[in-house]
Amino acid sequence: MILLEVNNRIIEETLALKFENAAAGNKPEAVEVTFADFDGVLYHISNPNGDKTKVMVSISLKFYKELQAHGADELLKRVYGSFLVNPESGYNVSLLYDLENLPASKDSIVHQAGMLKRNCFASVFEKYFQFQEEGKEGENRAVIHYRDDETMYVESKKDRVTVVFSTVFKDDDDVVIGKVFMQEFKEGRRASHTAPQVLFSHREPPLELKDTDAAVGDNIGYITFVLFPRHTNASARDNTINLIHTFRDYLHYHIKCSKAYIHTRMRAKTSDFLKVLNRARPDAEKKEMKTITGKTFSSR
């Protein structure tokens, strides 16, 4: 299985190139790039007010207001410090870099810029991981509508943090492949006792969402992660956040890859069957042609 990259490579490569050219004393060039990411996220890299010595990186998330309620602004201020500026119009967060005043740790700064989406997501996880560490219980469940028709729920208890993703399957084939995929996760946990518990429910929401307006339907699935202190403690939580916030994309990416592989194998098998049928086809019977006098035509 393939792990999706947590960072955004376009941001990192663009910024790294700008920093490298500035450090070499090259003349700055204009940049104007708009591109999308998973979960309807939109990025914009530009020169504010046409100033080529400044590079602005902005991100738009439809659900950012929900993240703000869980401390997203404070976390971003802690991570990005003075690089965080007022967001440009149409975006939720903007970072500004001055090519005439390069930071000392350029590689670290570039990497953190590439982690912008992840760091926006991280606030809700850090908040509930902290609740669990402090033994708090009864806090309101976090509800993040991270896609138009899909939702993430996070809830903490004294001994665990429960994260539930709702997801919509496009067709019946996706449901079947998704179930097989989730079964592999259950089998994997048997081999690793430190892995979190993973549960999958189809059509009906899990018991954790019994009193909510969680969606119900034949194309609805719910993936539940039960995270214990070994997954949420200070030394492990960064890696846990990296992996879990991309899980929905990870699941659907592999469903699409599986379908593509199956279709490729089907086409290959069909081609093999056609070759067998062509070899088995009898040769056309040659008819003997004669003239009215009884002579036989012969091909030259």
Swiss-Prot record:
Positions bearing N6-acetyllysine: K275, K295
Superkingdom assignment: Eukaryota
Cellular component aspect of the GO annotation: actin cytoskeleton; Arp2/3 protein complex; cytosol; endosome; extracellular exosome; focal adhesion; glutamatergic synapse; lamellipodium
Cysteine pairs bridged by disulfides in the record: none
Entry keyword annotation includes rRNA-binding: no
PANTHER family: ACTIN-RELATED PROTEIN 2_3 COMPLEX SUBUNIT 2, ARP2/3 COMPLEX 34 KDA SUBUNIT
Subunit structure: Component of the Arp2/3 complex composed of ACTR2/ARP2, ACTR3/ARP3, ARPC1B/p41-ARC, ARPC2/p34-ARC, ARPC3/p21-ARC, ARPC4/p20-ARC and ARPC5/p16-ARC. Interacts with SHANK3; the interaction probably mediates the association of SHANK3 with the Arp2/3 complex. Interacts with DNAI3; this interaction reduces binding of the Arp2/3 complex to the VCA domain of nucleation promoting factors.
Protein name: Actin-related protein 2/3 complex subunit 2
